[in-house]
Amino acid sequence: MEPVELITSKAISRDEVITFLLQMGVEREESPHRIWDYVIRRGEAIVWVDPDDVEHYPDPEVDALIENKLGGPPQTYVVLHISRNPGSEQLALELAIQFAKRWPSVLDNLSGLARRIFALDDLQTLYNRGLGLREDAKGVPLPKEWVDAGEEYLAPWQIEELEKQNREFLEIQE
């Protein structure tokens, strides 16, 4: 599952977002095992919707890009959780396009390697070409420090923990 975030410069109530989603074919998820309350399905394609995402972790560079593309500060965030099933990304694009036609919006693909902020025109181009929201990431090589041939990648915190454990082990041996 891959999350993307719809961001609009309009302050939209949760009820208004849900009304729009229901008009677009999104349904309330009734499963007792659900993670999110809303879902849209078409064949194998599935997109879960979190209509009132309240988690926002500031990133000044990305926030400035979003605000610049929106033409104002972000007000409402809606997260689409895209299944990896065939057709799910196109279904998410359709929903995002309709959302962006209704309210001034951008879509953040939340990709760590190739993060992009898409406006309505960008979304329509991707959809018409049959491309996905992470096409850029497919051609981006992993940074060299992440993976060196023949070496296991250890995050800095893992190295620090191993060094700490090694010091403790050596102290016990003495």
Give, region by region, the residue ranges found by the protein language model.
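Aromatic-residue detector
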Residues: 18, 77, 116-119
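Short, extreme N-terminal segment that most often corresponds to the first beta-strand
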Residues: 1-41, 168-174
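Hydrophobic beta-strand segments of well-ordered beta-sheets in folded domains
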Residues: 3-5, 76-78, 104-105
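Short, intrinsically disordered low-complexity segments
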Residues: 15, 24-90
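Short, flexible beta-strand-to-coil junctions
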Residues: 9-12, 80-88, 98-101, 110-112
